[in-house]
Amino acid sequence: DDLVKPGIKVIVVNPKTGGNGRMAYLAAWGYVKKKGGSDADAAEFVSKLYKNVPVLEDAGLSERLGEVMLYNALAALSQWDKAGMAVPMVSVNFSACELRNPRLAGKLKWELDRFNLEPQRLCIEVLENVVAETENDVIVSNIAALARLGCGIDLDDFGTGHASITSIRRFAVGRIKIDRSFVTHVDEDREQQKMLGAILSMAEQLGLGTLAEGGETAGEHAMLAQLGCGDVQGFGIAHPMPVEETVDWIINHRARQSVVPRIGQRAR
C-alpha cells in the first residue's frame, strides 16, 4: 500500500515528439520516489510496475494507483498551461481493472472538469493484451464511452499481443504504439525495416496514428522518420523526468528542434 500513500508520490514524465520535429505531447506516469532515489531508479520502478500489473490487481492497488496517476497527470497539464508551455495532451495508461469500473467515464469527466480541461487533451493508453483478450462488455463500453467523450485511445505495446484489425475497430483505437522490439536497431536490420514498414503501411491504410516506443539512437530516430512514423518516444528524445524539470526541458527542446530528425514525414 506504500505505492499510493500521500506524500511520496511524484510524476515522472516521458516526452514524445512528432509532427515536423515539434513536441506533440507528454506522457505522465505515476511512481514512488524514495528519499535518495535517482531518476533511473524511478524509471526502473515504472518498468517493473507495468510488468506486475496483475500483482497490483490481486492486491487491490491497481485502481487506486490509476487514480493517483490520472490526478497528477491532469494537474501537470494544468501547470504547463499556466506556464504557457502549450502542451497539447497527456497520455495515461489504464489497466483492465480500471476499465472494468462501470462508473469510469463519469469519474474521468469529473476529473477533467475539476481542472477545466477538455477531454481531447487526455489520451487513454490500453495494453494490446487487454484489447486482444477481453470479452468483458463493460470494458468495451467504457472505451467506447471515453472515445465518444473525446479522449484519444492508444493501443499500447502493439505487436506483442494478438489484437486483430476487428478488435482495433471495435475499441475505437486512434493510434498504435509500436513495441520497442520492432524499433531497436531498426536502422541496421533490413528485415526489421520491412516489418516496421509493413506495420506503418497497415496503420496508414486504417487511418491510425503511429508512435514508436524505444527510439534511443539518432540512427533509429532517422529511420523512423524515413519510414513515416508519426511520433517517437524513447531515451533518444529524453529520459523520464520529474514534472518540475519539464518546463526547462520543453524550452530547451524547442530551441534545438531544428537539428532533430523530422518525425512524421516520409523521406523524399
Residue ranges, per PLM feature:
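EAL-family c-di-GMP phosphodiesterase catalytic domain
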Residues: 66, 70, 95-102, 121-135, ...
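Helix C-cap/alpha-to-beta connector motif
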Residues: 68-94, 110-121, 149
